[in-house]
Amino acid sequence: MITIRKAEFVTSAVNIKGYPELTGPEIALAGRSNVGKSSLINKFINRRNLARTGNTPGKTQMLNFYRINDQWSFVDLPGYGYAKVSKEIKANWGKMMEEYFSRRENLRAVIQVVDIRHVPSVEDQEMHAFLRNRGIPVLVVATKADKISKGQWGKHLSQIAKALHIPDWHIIITYSAETGLGVPELHEAVEEILSMDNEDS
C-alpha cells in the first residue's frame, strides 16, 4: 500500500493555459458521468471529501488536478456519456480531452472507471480504443461491486473484458468505494506505474 502523507486539490482547468506546472508522473481518471471517479480518489487517499462528488451528470466540465505526497498527481477528467447537454458542450469536451492527452507530457497512465453492473457503453469503448491507439497505458477499474452479489462478478467482468477487447492476462480491478474492496490492488497497480517512472529517471 502506498502511504498517503499528503493529498491536496491543486486547481481546475479547461485548457492547457490553466494546467498547473507539476513535476513527477501524472495518472488520469476517465469514465462516464457519475461512475464514481471522485469517490475512487477519496477512498484511495483515505480522505472523505477531497475530490468533490456530484449528483448531476455532466456538471463537472473541468480537469481537476490533485497532488499526492508532493511527488505525483491524479487528474479527474470530465465525465462523458451524458445525454442532456448541448452539442457545443460535447464538442468542447472532445477538444479538452484531445488537448490534454496530446499535450500533457507527464501523463503516465489512465485509470478507466466503469460500472461493473453494466456492459461498457459505446463511449466507454471509444475512450478505451482512443487511449490504446495513442499508446497510453490503461488500467480498468470496475466500480460499484457492492451493488451486485459476489457470485455475479465473474460474469460481469467477462462482459467488460469482451466489450473493451481486454486480453485475458490483463487485470481488471473489482472495486467498491463503499466497502474498500479493491483498494489494496489499486494501490499496488498505481505503485507499479510510479515505479516504472522511477526506473526511467
From Swiss-Prot:
What is one Gene Ontology biological process annotated in the Swiss-Prot or TrEMBL record? division septum assembly
Residue ranges annotated for the EngB-type G domain, each copy included? 23-196
Its needed co-factors are: Mg(2+)
Q: Which residues are recorded as binding Mg(2+)?
A: 38, 60
Q: Provide a Gene Ontology MF annotation, just one.
A: metal ion binding
CC per GO annotation: cytosol
InterPro entries given in the database record: G_ENGB_dom, GTP-bd, GTP-bd_ribosome_bio_YsxC, P-loop_NTPase
Which amino acid positions bind GTP, per UniProt?
31-38, 58-62, 76-79, 143-146, 175-177
Output the CDD domains linked to this UniProt entry. YihA_EngB (cd01876)
Report keywords, A-Z: Cell cycle, Cell division, GTP-binding, Magnesium, Metal-binding, Nucleotide-binding, Septation
UniProt superkingdom: Bacteria
Question: Which family does the record claim for this protein?
Answer: Belongs to the TRAFAC class TrmE-Era-EngA-EngB-Septin-like GTPase superfamily. EngB GTPase family.
Entry-linked HAMAP family: GTPase_EngB
Its function?
A: Necessary for normal cell division and for the maintenance of normal septation.
Q: What is this protein called?
A: Probable GTP-binding protein EngB
Organism of this sequence:
Desulfitobacterium hafniense (strain Y51)
